[in-house]
Amino acid sequence: MARRPLVMGNWKLNGSKAFTKELITGLKDELNAVSGCDVAIAPPVMYLAEAETALVSSDIALGTQNVDLNKQGAFTGDISTEMLKDFGVKYVIIGHSERRQYHHESDEFIAKKFGVLKDAGLVPVLCIGESEAENEAGKTEEVCARQIDAVMNTLGVEAFNGAVIAYEPIWAIGTGKSATPAQAQAVHAFIRGHIAKQSQAVAERVIIQYGGSVNDANAAELFTQPDIDGALVGGASLKASAFAVIVKAAAKAKN
């Protein structure tokens, strides 16, 4: 079954009102004639209004970088699924290593977020991946399986229908290091195979992105791999020209 690739930009803690408008204008110009690849951006939640307005008449989808479990009430500083939907958000990144590390989010907590997003009709982008120490100890598959099982064991394998997984080896995030295409493919194939133990149909449909210093120089080679269905892009998503190269590479490789 052919899977439609998804390239998503994670802006992290970057941007301003002016930057948001300028970058989206650039992306619309660069990607105007591109088809065959879904595209999304996840700006800081502060700039969702600017992004929603700037994305009018564009096929670029809006995402965000976090969500709370609660819909409303006395939860200071949090953002609900309903608030995100109010701005036209489609994709929500959860489980990013920076959230796991700095905010001590557990596999179980992330699985709850996954369920909340599914219930709200939003698309979870579940980040998984191992640290450098875990990689060197040969625990990559063990870590990825554990992080996926946290969702499957509580919500069932069918929860991955219409969801996205982003394999992001922690040692490659923002470091300039990247897994080789063959290394990334091996892990992506493992992830798909692990899900296939529960459901071959779900495994064949689920989008598995690669993330970890994806840029305009290495994207094309990564996308030649059969189980890499796009990318979750950090730093390179802050430049319209670089991000467009990545999107075009995915569209070309997968069509």
Swiss-Prot record:
State any GO BP term from the record: glyceraldehyde-3-phosphate biosynthetic process
Reading the lineage from the top rank, the first entry is Bacteria
The EC number of this protein is: 5.3.1.1
Q: Which UniProt keywords apply?
A: Cytoplasm, Gluconeogenesis, Glycolysis, Isomerase
Q: Which residue positions are annotated as catalytic?
A: H96 (electrophile), E168 (proton acceptor)
Q: Which InterPro entries match?
A: Aldolase_TIM, TIM_sf, TrioseP_Isoase_bac/euk, Triosephosphate_isomerase, Triosephosphate_isomerase_AS
Name the GO cellular-component terms: cytosol
Q: Which chemical reaction does it catalyze?
A: D-glyceraldehyde 3-phosphate = dihydroxyacetone phosphate
**Top enzyme class:** isomerase
Instruction: State the compartments where it is located.
Output: Cytoplasm
Note the coiled coil stretches, chain numbering.
none
Among SUPFAM superfamilies, the record links this protein to: Triosephosphate isomerase (TIM)
Q: In which pathway does it act?
A: Carbohydrate biosynthesis; gluconeogenesis; Carbohydrate degradation; glycolysis; D-glyceraldehyde 3-phosphate from glycerone phosphate: step 1/1
Binding of substrate: at which residues? N10, W11, K12, G174, S213, G234, G235
Identify the Gene3D superfamilies for this entry: Aldolase class I
Family affiliation: Belongs to the triosephosphate isomerase family.
Q: Which NCBIfam families match?
A: tim
Subunit architecture: Homodimer.
Protein name per Swiss-Prot or TrEMBL = Triosephosphate isomerase
